[in-house]
């Protein structure tokens, strides 16, 4: 695999997001554009110039934390270091920009995402109760 992490390719990130099977409904390009501002970081992982993963975040809370809003890796490229490479770049960038932590939100049913985050040093900070326990949202944070 010839993995390359590039910054700023929002269309590539949205293209990958639409192919992530865990995302039951995906955001259109205009939703990304309306949420993101100058604080945003858009990363796309490419293999042979084809997008295979992405990570998008921004300064949502204005409290020193960077919000890792959306991200994913195509199933055929999982367990190959793509998610770690994206997270490494995001964390280094956030530190350089002066952020003191990274926050993310996932769902209880995404066990692989929860395990990945815990392995990278994230703590569970707050559950958001839901009638369907599998749909419960879970906030996580990593101090940088």
Feature map (PLM): residue ranges:
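Conserved acetyl-CoA-binding loop-helix of GNAT-fold acetyltransferases
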Residues: 73, 79-92, 115, 119
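Conserved GNAT acetyl-CoA-binding A-motif
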Residues: 94-106
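Short hydrophobic/aromatic beta-strand element in the GNAT-like acyltransferase core
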Residues: 40-44, 54, 70, 103, ...
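Active-site rim helix/loop that mediates acceptor-substrate recognition in acyltransferases
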Residues: 22-46, 56
């Amino acid at each position: 695999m010839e993995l390359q992490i590039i910054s700023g390719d929002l269309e590539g990130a949205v293209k990958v997001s639409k192919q992530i099977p865990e995302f039951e409904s995906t955001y259109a390009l205009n939703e990304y554009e309306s949420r993101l501002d100058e604080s945003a970081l858009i990363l796309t992982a490419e293999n042979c110039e084809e997008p295979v993963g992405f990570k998008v975040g921004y300064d949502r809370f204005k409290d020193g934390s960077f919000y890792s809003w959306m991200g994913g890796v195509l199933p055929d490229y999982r367990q190959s270091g793509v998610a770690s490479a994206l997270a490494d770049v995001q964390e280094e960038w956030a530190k350089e920009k002066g952020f003191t932590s990274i926050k993310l939100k996932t769902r209880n049913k995404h066990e692989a995402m929860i395990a990945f985050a815990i392995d990278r040093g994230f703590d569970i900070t707050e559950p958001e109760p839901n009638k369907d326990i599998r749909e419960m949202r879970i906030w996580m944070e990593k101090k940088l």
